[in-house]
Amino acid sequence: MPKTKKAHRHAPDWIILTIACLAQFMVVLDVSIVNVALPSMQRDLHFTIDSAQWVVNAYVLTFAGFLLLGGRAADIFGRRRVYLTGLTVFTIASIGAGFAATGSQMVAVRALQGIGGAILSPATLTIIVTTFHGKRLPRALGLWSAVAGAGGAVGGLLGGLLTGWASWRWVFFINVPFGILAGVLALRYLREMRNRDAAVKLDVTGAVLVTGSLAALIYGVVNTTTVVNSRAIGWTATSTLLWFLGAALGLATFFIWETQVASHPLVPLRIFHVRSLSMANLVMLLIGGAFFSMWYFLTFYYQYILGYGPVKTGFAFLPMAIAIIVGAQTSSRLLPKLHARPLLLIGTSLATLGFLWLSRIGVHSSYTVDVLAPSALCALAIGLLFTPLASAATTGVDRADAGLASGVLNTSRQLGGSLGLAVLGTLAADASARFARPLSAAALTSGYERAFQVSAGIALIALATSLAVPKVIVAHPNH
């Protein structure tokens, strides 16, 4: 049973939503805001082209690796304590990134920032699902989903504006006022809540095994794109296969430990018996694979093919942010009436159509005629999907496992995004190389077309998987 400490003062719904959404916005924003600033960062910190990718990879690696631990920590130590811990680590790391003087310093603080994000992000969803109930929950999830989805698009806009008008360092400093505001509100209004039965039990061995295994898996994936002697290492390189082997052995050991040895497992595998949670995470894995790469490829398409600068690239993403917000708000209003599965079917259908449409872009395409509508359609699909996925993944579980369910869902999204970007990046590079060498604008566009075609196929698989999500999800008695 949850144990609740007396709040410092009664908090209106909008303040709790602000506490959760502000922190989630910071975490999601930092995944995309760096992309537009990378060329300037690379020049000032004297990165090589090959090593600059680790500004992104270091964050992704630790963020994905620590998400399950962060989610379970919110259940065990309390959502308020974990939220403030993650927020502090994330904000301090942002300051460090803004002041970084060398490439190695930047990679180190980005890794620390990823750990802070992994602690913080599951806590934000835990705050939502343990505070709001009944008809209030879909509305709260809708706003949280809108913020989570729009952060990717807004990151491109803010990154372009800050890099073009100030300095790339401000893509990190921008987190500081948000972090201070969120921290003050949490200290003043957020009450503590944790699982009394698990209050003093943390499965340290399980945490080490799953964190190390996921980190090895993600490292193996990003290792495929590492360039050595002008060629990517690829999927069949010995180093890549060794990382995958280590991840497989670690996950197998983790499974045995959790099911046979641990008295208080980090991830009680019983939660995967909840079909809504299992299927929602599978859909999220697929959707993450398709959508994470969209931001990446469109950023390069705008700058290298259409010739946009950082600021114009940022504004090109603005309609997508608006579409995500519209989709999320629409989804939150329809969820109590339609339930999750119909919304998932609609969202994945729109995503499939949007990616197919995007796959028709060319060297001489126009943004307003050929890119705006399909990218907005994909963004609308993101908004429609996140709310029912969050609802399906958390409604059927005990409130004592809310943080864990949040961590699992975030892990699925991040793991899908990392795998999707690596696979689609490899396919795009292969298509470009087959088209022409040295690479031309037409060759690069050919690679982007291939990536969007495969993304449409992934979205179609997600559509089929959505049929397995229960039509009506019964809430757990202790939810």
Label each PLM-derived region with a short phrase.
Residues 7-9, 183-212, 227-236, 260-275, ...:
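Flexible interhelical linker loops that connect adjacent transmembrane helices
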Residues 12, 16-63, 167, 205, ...:
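Transmembrane core module of solute transporters
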Residues 177-195, 211-226, 246-261, 462-472:
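C-terminal membrane-cytosol helix-exit motif in multi-pass small-molecule transporters
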Residues 41-42, 73-74, 158-166, 221, ...:
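Interfacial helix-cap and linker-helix signal at transmembrane-aqueous boundaries
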Residues 2-188, 330-331, 338, 344, ...:
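Transmembrane-helix bundle of Major Facilitator Superfamily
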Residues 151-184, 202-210, 218-244:
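Helix-loop-helix hairpin linking two adjacent transmembrane segments in secondary transporters
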Residues 23, 143-147, 205, 283, ...:
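Hydrophobic alpha-helical segments of secondary membrane carriers
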Residues 77-89, 100-108, 120-126, 132-143, ...:
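C-terminal module of multi-pass small-molecule transporters
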